[in-house]
Regions:
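Active-site residues of response regulator receiver
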Residues: 52
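Two-component/phosphorelay signaling modules centered on CheY-like receiver
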Residues: 11-29
């Protein structure tokens, strides 16, 4: 079963998002800040990291960089309520929170090789 780490400082959003991902057949684990996410990343393997753009302490770009230092193959998807952002080279995609599902599910399927991207979906960061 493919594993997804979902990081958001809004615990309710993180838990609900994990429930939706689990209903789609993924193993989903939540973390509520970057430090907790890195600890969980050290404890187990994840196929994808989904992280909030703004969090207390470590932000999304710092978290993506640290995750890629450990495993550069893990796609990082940023979710934000602040409009389009550029996450840099460590970010595979950026999605708006208000349109999170089903867009997140589509990106996950693409990054896990479960679906071919349409030409306009190749990179949206």
């Amino acid at each position: 079963m493919r594993a997804i780490l979902f990081v958001d400082d809004h615990e309710v959003l993180a838990r609900l998002s994990c429930e939706i991902l689990e209903m789609q057949g993924y193993r989903a684990v939540s973390a509520y800040n970057g430090t907790e996410a890195l600890k969980k990343f050290d404890e187990e393997d994840f196929d994808i990291l989904v992280t909030d753009f703004r969090m207390d302490g470590m932000n999304d770009v710092e978290l993506a960089k640290k995750v890629h230092e450990k495993n550069p193959e893990v796609p990082v998807i940023i979710v934000t309520g602040y409009g389009p952002i550029d996450g840099g080279k460590d970010v595979a995609a950026c999605l708006q929170k208000e349109d999170l599902f089903p867009a997140l599910l589509e990106k996950i399927k693409i990054f896990l090789g479960e679906r071919e991207p349409r030409p306009q979906e190749v990179k949206t960061a």
